[in-house]
């Protein structure tokens, strides 16, 4: 299993719509010159962006967090260019990009150091072979202060690994519960 380069990422995005929308190079500023947290193709990965729709965790309803029976009222929906995550809390978001992962590929996603150095952890599970959809992102604010997340800017890097052998059963074959997801998707069982 080997990591894939920028050339492979560009080719797969352009010829197979693996990433839409796609930035073939690193974008570090807006068109008017304002600096942003970078996104787009890097040497051996792709820096993904956070869309402007968020679900911010709240404990107003004083419920128990149960992944098998998650209470949707535990979140407050928010849409905007900046999301403020309360201290020691978290928020869900989704990527701007829609992914179509080839059958021979598995990805690993790691948070960008810009956020990690501020105590904001980005968690994303691997994108499995033949999974497609918007990626649901989880941001944990590990600090005792409110934390900002910027929409339409880079938040994490996706690394693509291609296997030397095709899997017997892909995510699509087994009817994965998050296949084709759009928007911020809550836990499913």
Curated annotation (Swiss-Prot):
- Pfam families this protein is in? DCD
The record's keywords, sorted A to Z, are: Hydrolase, Nucleotide metabolism, Nucleotide-binding
Instruction: Give the metabolic or biological pathway.
Output: Pyrimidine metabolism; dUMP biosynthesis; dUMP from dCTP (dUTP route): step 1/2
Q: Where does dCTP bind?
A: 112-117, 136-138, 157, 171, 181
Name a single GO biological process: dUMP biosynthetic process
Catalytic reactions of this protein: dCTP + H2O + H(+) = dUTP + NH4(+)
Which residues carry out catalysis? 138 (proton donor/acceptor)
Select a single GO molecular function from the record's annotations and give it.
nucleotide binding
Under which EC number(s) is this enzyme classified?
3.5.4.13
The record ties this protein, via NCBIfam families, to: dCTP_deam
Write out the similarity annotation: Belongs to the dCTP deaminase family.
Could you identify this protein by its name?
dCTP deaminase
Organism of derivation: Paraburkholderia phymatum (strain DSM 17167 / CIP 108236 / LMG 21445 / STM815) (Burkholderia phymatum)
| Biological classification of the source | Bacteria, Pseudomonadati, Pseudomonadota, Betaproteobacteria, Burkholderiales
Chain's gene name: dcd
């Amino acid at each position: 299993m080997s990591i894939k380069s920028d050339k492979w990422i560009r080719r797969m995005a352009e010829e197979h719509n693996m990433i839409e929308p796609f930035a073939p190079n690193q974008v570090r500023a807006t068109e008017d010159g304002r600096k942003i947290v970078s996104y787009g193709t890097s040497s051996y990965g792709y820096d993904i962006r956070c869309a402007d729709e968020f679900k911010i965790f709240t404990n107003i309803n004083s419920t128990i967090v149960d992944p098998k029976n998650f209470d949707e009222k535990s979140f407050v929906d928010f849409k905007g260019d900046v999301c403020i995550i309360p201290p020691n809390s978290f928020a869900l978001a989704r990527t701007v990009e829609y992914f179509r992962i080839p059958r021979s590929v598995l990805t690993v996603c790691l948070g960008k150091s810009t956020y990690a150095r501020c105590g904001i952890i980005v968690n994303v599970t691997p994108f499995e072979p033949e999974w497609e959809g918007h990626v649901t992102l989880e941001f944990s604010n590990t600090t005792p202060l409110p934390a900002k997340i910027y929409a339409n800017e880079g938040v994490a890097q996706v690394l693509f690994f291609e296997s030397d052998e095709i899997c017997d059963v892909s995510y699509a074959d087994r009817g994965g519960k998050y296949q084709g997801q759009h928007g911020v998707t809550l836990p499913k069982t």
